[in-house]
Amino acid sequence: HLNAGFPSSEEGLAAWDRWVRTIAEHYKGVVIDWCIWNEPNGKTSGNTIEQATDFAVRTAEILRGIIPDARIAAFALTEADPKWIEPFVKELEKRGKAYLFNTIAYHHYKHNPDTGYEEVEESRRIVARHTPNIRLMQGEGGTQSEWCRNGALSNVFWTELTQAKYDLRRSLGDLGHGDDTEVFHLCDLEYRAVKRHYGLLRYGLLKTAGQADGFRVLKVKTAYYAIQNAVSVFNDALECLSPERTGSTLQGVENCVVYDWKDRETDTPVVVFWDASAMPSNDNITRQATVSVAGNPIQNPVWVDLLTGNVYKIEESHIERSEGRTVYTVPVYDSPAFITSQDILTLDQSWFVREGKNMKRYH
């Protein structure tokens, strides 16, 4: 339903209600996450906020009636647009219908994935003021692994490396700002009936063939392993700290971002950071920087590169203590890495290590 209008006739709405009821009953006990309508605020949709509110409420009432514990997202907006979100949540507040929804989903396509959070923050404040039970969720973000002529962020010479960096930065940036996040897409897509998106689009974590070749999986992309590395650490075992509870800083590289997490069981710090100054580059040039973390030194500290999954010991010569803080000298580049204790990580040694090869420490 990309940029499509809602059914509006009595007959059309009745058919929609039957379809929602049927699909909810079919997937009850299997599917818990539901999102109502893709990009209803698209420029060519012709939808008004009033229509969208009515439509979302009637759909959510059917879903909630059949699947009481469903997690329902109101829309998947083209962006976190405060001009769309504010009247929607005000109307939910007025009608007493906020309980129907868990989240409002938005899409976030920026060439530099670390830009554009201003409107997200503004929208979050609006939602918290009027419907505090609802959260924002980044519901579609990512980029392609090669040059493609169509789709969001198209006509750019992306590579598997820049895609992997982008997906990591998008995901950890969203989580760091307090929003749940999704990666678009598991596998490559082929559009044949949509003029604007015609052909193969390479957003997938898996590279697939087109319809003519049976949609075969051709390879596992770099981004697949990068996201696998990220979710193996940044999951419910960790807590992302709000800005007022964080204190880590980074010096030596301009325009870096730093997000503080902690292990829920041990309170061990997990500090993730990267160079956010530009869109991802097609090289891995690192620069040394210092990361200052509040409190005593981390036991058995390591620097972890999420792009590769490699874990490196931080030598004592790279650690300083000063006025209740610990400063670590580590590499920084335009892909996320983090500092934590090796004690909270479960390591899967590569064949290189298992075979007894010597690996050089980073410099």
Model-derived regions, located:
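Structural recognition of the beta-strand scaffold that forms the well-ordered cores
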Residues: I32-I36, R71-A74, N102-Y106, R135-E140, ...
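C-terminal beta-strand-rich structural cap/linker in extracellular carbohydrate-active enzymes
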Residues: K313-Y362
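Active-site cleft segment of glycoside hydrolase catalytic domains centered on the general acid/base Glu
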Residues: L2-R129, W147-R169, K195-L201, T286, ...
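Flexible loop residues that form catalytic
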Residues: E39, A80, Y109, G141, ...
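Solvent-exposed beta-hairpin/edge-strand motifs
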Residues: V291-V311
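Carbohydrate-binding surface patches
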Residues: G247-P297, F338-T340
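Aromatic/acidic polysaccharide-binding cleft in carbohydrate-active enzymes
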Residues: E146-V253
